Amino acid sequence: MNQEYDMMAHKPIFPLLMKMAIPPMISMLIQSKDNIIDSIFVAKLGEEALTALSLAFPLQNLSLAFSVGLGVAINALIAKSLGASDEKQANYISDHGIFLAILHSLLFVFIGIFLMKPFFLMFTTNPTVLDYAITYGSIVITFTFGSIIHITIEKMFQATGNMMIPMFLQGIGAIVNIILDPILIFGINGYLEFGVAGAAIATIIGQMTACLLAIILFRKTSRIKVSLKNFKPNAQIIKNIYSIAIPSGVMTSLPSILVALLNSLLATVSQTAIAFFGIYFKLQSFIYMPANGL
């Protein structure tokens, strides 16, 4: 029995809640940072670039919402199995978590390749804004698999009571993004100047870095073991996962749907209105995302 599990089994509820709630709250706060960090730097490229990121924000948050929904479900089922001292079942559920995370990643690859332009055409006909939005959105959605797999592994860590590693991983991803954003957006001495595309690339590299570290640390430190060799999906486990993941994902995605609807209304006013509303909502996300961590 490891230290985290022993703590979960025997420590008083309130101190345990405080010890376990703060790291995931910080982690969820950092999870909402990608588009916000990008927007800070992209704003220097002009209003049209900032508007493009505001249009991409709901779709980016939607992918995050369903990733978190899947992670919450995996977390709950693993914790239940560990509570029953059934480590073999916990491992099997973890296998399903990684398997479904890969399938979700393929779905977002399809969305990123084929649905970007139709989606953004609902909100703007400005060719510059449309080009920026498609460029940024296509990159961050098509290559979001790093974020999806990372979040799934993060929730597996949390299911065993380990709250610090997920927070550390989110912090590393954010730091990489912050460092690379100005370099890849504005370039250095005329090199690596990619503009809006650079913001998206920096985000993806940050996510991939966190994902790679998550895989390494999970393999080395977690009591849960994942192996897709000879893996056979179990319909009942998948049903149990989605019975939690779908409601959780839908609830978490509602703000993103609201933003998309409001963007469609603001588009009839001006592109500036979309840009300003995007800034407001990104700041607001710093309030409700930590609550999801609790």
Short names for language-model regions:
Residues 25, 29, 33, 37, ...:
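Generic alpha-helical transmembrane segments of integral inner-membrane proteins
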Residues 9-29, 137-141, 164-171, 213, ...:
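Hydrophobic faces of transmembrane alpha-helices in multi-pass small-molecule transporters and flippases
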Residues 101, 156-183, 200, 204, ...:
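Alpha-helical transmembrane segments of multi-pass membrane transporters/permeases
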Residues 1-21, 78-145, 191-246:
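Short alpha-helical transmembrane segments in multi-pass integral membrane proteins
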Residues 50-110, 114, 147-166, 258, ...:
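Small-residue-rich hydrophobic transmembrane alpha-helices
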Residues 33-51, 120-127, 183-193, 253-286:
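Helix-terminus/linker motif at the lipid-water interface of multi-pass membrane proteins
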Residues 22, 26, 56-59, 99-103, ...:
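Hydrophobic residues within alpha-helical transmembrane segments
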Residues 15-75, 79, 246-266:
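Signature of the first transmembrane helix
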